[in-house]
Regions:
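Residue-level detector of anion-binding/catalytic polar loops
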Residues: 38, 59, 119, 157-158
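Short amphipathic alpha-helices in soluble, non-transmembrane regions
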Residues: 109-113, 145-157
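Helix N-cap motif at beta-to-alpha junctions
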Residues: 102, 138-146
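Conserved short beta-strand edge segments in small beta-sheet-based binding/regulatory domains
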Residues: 121-124, 153-164
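A short, glycine/Asx- and small/polar-enriched loop/turn
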Residues: 130-136
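Cytosolic beta-strand hydrophobic patch enriched in CBS
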Residues: 1, 40-41, 59-73
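A structural signal for short, well-ordered beta-strand elements
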Residues: 39-42, 141
Length: 164
């Protein structure tokens, strides 16, 4: 999109519609394309591809194998993966808990949910402001909101909990 905008005439142009049409008919893909294209290998991790896309503000990346184009990964692909990772299409209890980043703390948390009959559909950890802690986003089914809240409070500080 940016390449096409750069190649298009300015809106402030004095050219009439016919002159614009003529000029655009002479415009080729070669004149508008990005030549120094960032790519990823087919065996690269999805999170690394997402990081490259985010850092470079790219909407997509060509995927290569042995110097051959084998596909493309797009921001829409990453959104679909994000939805899948968070089990966004499944109803349940979703909680964000800040807990100690000590060995076994996540295991204790997930075991308590399981012992209460909960089925963990998704569990994602992210950095907290304090490096001694992690933010854990968990989504579980087959568990009551109040039961899940009690477990979350036993294991850390609840930032958010809700039925979704």
């Amino acid at each position: 999109e940016n390449d096409l905008q750069k190649a298009a005439p300015s809106q402030a142009t004095t050219l009439d519609m016919y002159e614009l049409t003529y000029l655009l008919s002479k415009l080729t893909v070669e004149k508008t394309m990005t030549k120094d294209v960032k790519t990823v290998s087919f065996d690269e991790t999805v999170e690394e591809a997402a990081r490259i896309m985010s850092d470079g503000d790219f909407g997509c990346l060509p995927v290569m194998k042995d110097n051959l184009l084998v596909g493309i990964i797009t921001d829409s692909d990453l959104f679909r993966m994000f939805i899948e990772m968070f089990s966004a299409r499944t109803s349940g209890v979703r909680a964000i808990v800040q807990m100690s980043d000590e060995p076994g703390s996540l295991s204790v948390f997930t075991q308590k949910i399981a012992m209460a009959g909960g089925i963990i559909m998704s569990c994602i950890t992210t950095e907290a402001e304090n490096p001694a802690f992690r933010k854990v986003t968990v989504k579980a089914t087959n568990i009551a909101l109040n039961t899940c809240k009690e477990i979350c409070e036993q294991c850390g500080t609840v930032e958010d909990i809700r039925e979704v």
